[in-house]
Amino acid sequence: MVSAIDSTDIVSEAEKIHKTSAVVTAALGRLLTATSMMGNMLKGKDNSITLKIAGDGPAGSLITAADADGNVRGYVMNPVVEIPLKENGKLDVCGAVGKNGSLYVIKDLGLKEPYNGFVPITSGEIAEDITAYYAISEQIPTVCALGVLVNPDLTVKKAGGYIIQLLPAADDLVIDKLEENVKKAKPVTTMLESGMDIEDIVKSVLEGFEVEVLYTENPEYKCKCSRDRVERALISLGSKELDSMADELPVSEVKCHFCDKVYKFTSEEIKKLSKNCKKTLDIKP
């Protein structure tokens, strides 16, 4: 099974929202790309997935989340990181993310409890870490390739990736041929820049295999925040905290981490939420 994506528009939107430096755009872009594909691989329409990579690099934690259509959102703790390029002239994603830490994967599959998995960071380059997650946590042989090409003006030129997973019945000939194809495959952004589309890329990495396109999606960078969600989050703070906010500030602002949208609440609105909080407490058995 193969999932592939041209995530240029998604990563571009993330860069515009978070105003990331080049290396952080590459890091967050890779994680957004992987998360979108992993979300689209979920079977239930209402399923969702969240990835968090928490390394010891200057970028801090990166968090992304996607629905089953591949629509994705994300943010990074430190959006601006300036570090030297690697010796080969490429962006040092590993240097920004760090080599020590963990990759966490949380899947909401509509069950009582979400599935939680985590693995130590393998390389900090994101793709290798995704591959390690599938091998260790889900025991699925996987190839993951991710790429983000950033222009000198910090805009995103190309971004994309693919995930290949072997079926349990795959024989050695299939595995050997796939390994050969992957080794000679050009970087995803190189293929996109040359004019290849996603189907071309899949056919390239699966050369020698019969390729059938099962379905296509058009995922976007899409935030799920709303005023109602923010109100529920505020209520969860408790009436004491809300009363304090109402007394101290004439207007309170709450900013969404994923899209930077600001929600404003007057002190009267905060007091009303506090009353709702108290009512909720009163009706508890």
Model-derived segments and spans:
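Cys/His-clustered metal-coordination modules, chiefly Zn-binding fingers
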Residues: K183-P285
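Interaction interfaces in information-processing and related assembly proteins
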Residues: M1-Y215
